Amino acid sequence: MATNRSIIHPAARFTNKVAIVTGGAGGLGRQICLSLGAEGGKVAVFDTNSEAIEQTVADLIAAGIDAVGHPVDVRDSATVTAAVGAVAAYFGRIDILIAAAGGSLATPRDLADISPADLDLVIDVNVKGTFNCAQAVVPHLINAGGGAIVTFSSIGGRSTSPVTGVPYAAAKAAILGLTRRLAKEVGPAGIRVNAVAPGLFLTGRLQGMFDELAESDRAEVLGGIPLGRMPELQECVDPVLFLASDQSSYITGAVLDVNGGRFMAG
């Protein structure tokens, strides 16, 4: 029998919720942190860039948001576990993990030009990093009576995008399997695990690369997107917040495509 649920106003979605955001000091991750805090969340910023962490945390605190930062390489299980423990000790609980840290090779390469070190780098930061964070956070989510994990796949893990390369495609596809299997395992504890699969969005280096394209090349890129445009950064953030919030309380093991229809287009 269905139960009545109160309507959740977006402005109150994360009140008193504690969220860890990996890759949280730059680009999309930083915007996720700011948006969580704007909706009442308490935020722990994990990143490898100490200076960017300091600035992001300062900006959060200046906005009246309870925030801490930790320099974390998600590939290092011991460092991840220690930082997660420090967050739990500081805030008293953890409710949300947003595993936004990831990476790819600077430029796509053909199979023959990919070294074992190249493959290890991409697999480790994406797959091993997500695994390490989930493994460290899940016990704290259980202690909190449940929670949410949002992982990051990509359109590159769901289609044969020519701009991603084999290691990145393999890593982002693996995250989908990790997400589904973990969702099944931890569901009985009230923990939801879902993935977002963004298409191309322009921040930092990618913005510069896109701006340098000839007009005809930019038109070709946009022509592959049924909506005909690139997303605003917040349009990538909002689906993440939805999956992290109680508005998606009956969704787990799912992947949410955020690509303007690019995946549908082939």
Residue ranges, per PLM feature:
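A conserved structural motif in NAD(P)-dependent oxidoreductases
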Residues: I225-C236
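Alpha-helical segment proximal to the catalytic Tyr-Lys
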Residues: P139, K184-P188, S249
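Residue(s) in the substrate-gating loop at a strand-loop-helix junction
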Residues: S154
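Substrate-binding pocket helix/loop in short-chain dehydrogenase/reductase
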Residues: P108-L111, S115-I123, D217, V221
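Canonical Rossmann dinucleotide-binding motif of NAD(H)/NADP(H)-dependent dehydrogenases/reductases
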Residues: A12-A44
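Active-site helix of classical SDR
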Residues: A134, A171, T179
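Short C-terminal tail/terminal secondary-structure segment
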Residues: A2-P10, P108, L241, T252-G266
